[in-house]
A protein has these predicted regions:
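C-terminal binding/interaction regions
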Residues: 1-49, 55-137
Length: 137
């Protein structure tokens, strides 16, 4: 399954992330948080069963023109069940982690448009189609 979401912030906050040193690399820490979140989804969500994981990938795309970061998480499991809940959990944990590290620079940070892009595994599954037509990606 593949999910993504955005975090919008001030130009100062985004520059802090771009210029962050390796010891305090905001996106690396957010990536670790998201991967840890994959393993904890069944503990965080009532009635959600643990999924044995095969693959977790966390990517970030920085758009300096609009001071926004897109987080994309792809999760595959060893079971036949999909990993949609894990992917959505991970995206939000990555965004919250970024928020937590730059909130002292910008108190108007907005996390938005967290959604599922692909359901199922990488070889088969349903692509998200924005049926409602009211979301601007």
């Amino acid at each position: 399954a593949k999910a993504c979401g955005y975090i919008n912030m001030s130009p100062d906050a985004i520059q802090t992330i771009v210029n962050s040193v390796q010891k305090n690399d905001v996106l690396s820490i957010a990536r670790i948080a998201a991967i840890q979140g994959t393993k904890q989804a069944s503990l965080l969500l009532p009635l959600h069963h643990f999924q044995p994981l095969a693959h977790v990938r966390v990517d970030f795309a920085i758009d300096l023109d609009v001071s926004r970061i897109k987080a994309t998480v792809t999760v595959a499991t060893k079971s036949k069940n999909g990993a949609e809940v894990e992917a959505l959990t991970d995206v939000n944990i990555a965004l919250i982690s970024i928020y937590d590290m730059v909130k002292s620079i910008d108190n108007n940070i907005v996390m938005t448009q967290s959604h599922l892009e692909k359901e199922g595994n990488e070889k088969e599954g349903l692509d998200y189609d924005n049926t409602y037509g009211n979301l601007d990606f």
